[in-house]
C-alpha cells in the first residue's frame, strides 16, 4: 500500500508535534510526505501536480493542527481547488476506492472534546464535514489519529505520538471492515463460534 501524507501546518518549523510527526513519517516505509504549506507559500496551488500525487497513492492522510474546530486555511483552499468537478466528483471518480485518514493535533485535552467538555462536541462530530467530503469523492473515511493536549505535551509524549501515528497510518487493518473480516477469519480458524 502506498501512503501519501499531505501536511497542512502553516508554520511547521515552529511546530513541536507536527514537526516530530513529519520526521517520523519521512523514515517510514511506503510513506510519501508532502509539506503543502511549504510548497505553496503564495497560495498558488499546482492542481495537476496535486491530483497526480493523489492518484499515485492508495491511502491519503491529511495531517494538520485543529484550527477553530476545522482545518487550516490552505487545506480548505487545497480541497476546493484540487477536488475538481469531473475529476473527484460530479462524474469524476479519480479518488474512488482510496482511503482517507485524518491526523490531527489539538491544543486542548481529550476530555474537552465531548458532551459536557468545554468544546461541547466530540472530535467525531467536528470531523463530519471532512467525512462527508471523503464520501463525496468516493474515498473510505477511516478512523482518525488525534493527539490531544499538544500545548502541554512533553517531548517524550510527542515522540511516542509520532511512533503511534506511523503505526496507525500503516496499519493494514485500519479499515474497520477489514479488521472485522480478519477477526471473523481468526475465530473460524480457531473453531470459535458465537
Residue ranges and their predicted role:
Residues 1-37, 166, 170:
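N-terminal beta1-alpha1 ligand-phosphate binding loop
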Residues 4-6, 32-34, 61, 101-103, ...:
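Hydrophobic/aromatic beta-strand patches that form the interior of the parallel beta-sheet core
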Residues 16-20, 45, 73-77, 156:
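Generic recognition of short, well-ordered alpha-helical segments
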Residues 22, 26, 131-194:
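Glycine-rich phosphate/pyrophosphate-binding loop and the adjoining helix
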Residues 32-55:
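N-terminal beta-loop-helix "entrance" segment that forms/cooperates
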Residues 48-131:
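Helix-loop-strand module that forms the ligand-binding subsite of alpha/beta enzymes
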Amino acid at each position: 500500500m502506498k501512503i501519501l501524507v499531505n501536511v497542512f501546518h502553516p508554520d511547521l518549523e515552529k511546530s513541536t508535534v507536527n514537526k516530530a510527526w513529519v520526521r517520523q513519517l519521512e523514515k517510514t516505509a511506503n510513506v510519501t510526505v508532502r509539506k503543502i504549506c511549504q510548497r505553496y507559500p503564495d497560495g498558488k496551488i499546482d492542481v495537476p501536480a496535486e491530483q497526480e500525487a493523489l492518484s499515485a497513492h492508495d491511502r491519503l492522510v491529511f495531517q494538520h493542527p485543529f484550527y477553530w474546530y476545522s482545518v487550516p486555511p490552505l487545506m480548505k483552499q487545497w480541497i476546493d481547488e484540487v477536488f475538481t468537478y469531473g475529476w473527484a466528483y460530479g462524474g469524476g471518480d479519480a479518488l474512488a476506492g482510496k482511503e482517507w485518514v485524518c491526523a490531527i493535533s489539538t491544543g486542548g485535552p481529550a476530555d474537552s472534546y465531548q458532551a459536557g467538555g468545554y468544546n461541547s462536541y466530540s472530535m467525531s462530530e467536528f470531523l463530519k464535514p471532512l467525512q462527508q467530503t471523503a464520501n463525496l469523492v468516493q474515498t473510505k473515511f477511516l478512523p482518525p489519529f488525534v493527539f490531544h493536549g499538544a500545548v502541554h505535551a512533553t517531548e517524550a509524549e510527542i515522540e511516542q505520538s509520532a511512533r503511534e501515528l506511523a503505526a496507525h497510518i500503516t496499519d493494514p487493518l485500519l479499515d474497520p471492515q477489514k479488521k472485522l473480516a480478519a477477526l471473523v477469519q481468526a475465530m473460524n480458524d480457531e473453531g470459535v463460534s458465537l
